[in-house]
């Protein structure tokens, strides 16, 4: 396979992940119920053609979930609103109800870091099913979700009411 063929294959795989999300049948059901996907929310919010996604190929760390967790239930990146840069992310409820796990949380963390470094706003389209219990069990899982909320507070100088 040549480099152009590899590049074309990579783009085709990314497009399939973006199109299929957590499964075509789930997307159809959402539309029948009058709901939109998080991708649709993001595309309608941002200026047309400006969304640059990160982590398209990410998926669950758990081997038994890798084949059905595109993006690990989180979609995010950078784009523009009225020609101004913004970071945007959301919970993909077509993938395990948008539940949080280690990889999705890391992706969120990376978006927060980049947004704060660039000094741009963050918009979150939230509709999560909570945390994935198997992913938050054990030392690695327990350290991830809480670490993100503490990091957010420290990074933006936020103080929580006591």
Regions found by a protein language model. Name each.
Residues 1-162:
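Terminal-region recognition feature
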């Amino acid at each position: 396979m040549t480099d152009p063929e590899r590049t074309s294959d990579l783009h085709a795989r990314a497009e399939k992940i973006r199109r299929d999300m957590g499964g075509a049948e789930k997307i159809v059901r959402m539309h029948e119920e009058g709901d939109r996907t998080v991708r649709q929310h993001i595309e309608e919010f941002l200026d047309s053609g400006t969304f640059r996604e990160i982590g398209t190929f990410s998926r669950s760390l758990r081997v038994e979930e890798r084949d059905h967790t595109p993006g690990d239930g989180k979609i995010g990146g950078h784009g523009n609103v009225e020609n101004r840069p913004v970071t945007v992310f959301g919970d993909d409820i077509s993938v395990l109800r948008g539940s949080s796990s280690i990889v999705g949380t890391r992706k969120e963390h990376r978006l927060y870091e980049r947004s704060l470094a660039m000094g741009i706003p963050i918009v979150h389209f939230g509709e999560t099913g909570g945390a994935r219990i198997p992913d938050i069990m054990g030392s690695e899982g327990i350290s991830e979700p809480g670490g993100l909320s503490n990091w957010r507070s420290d990074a933006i100088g936020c103080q929580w009411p006591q």
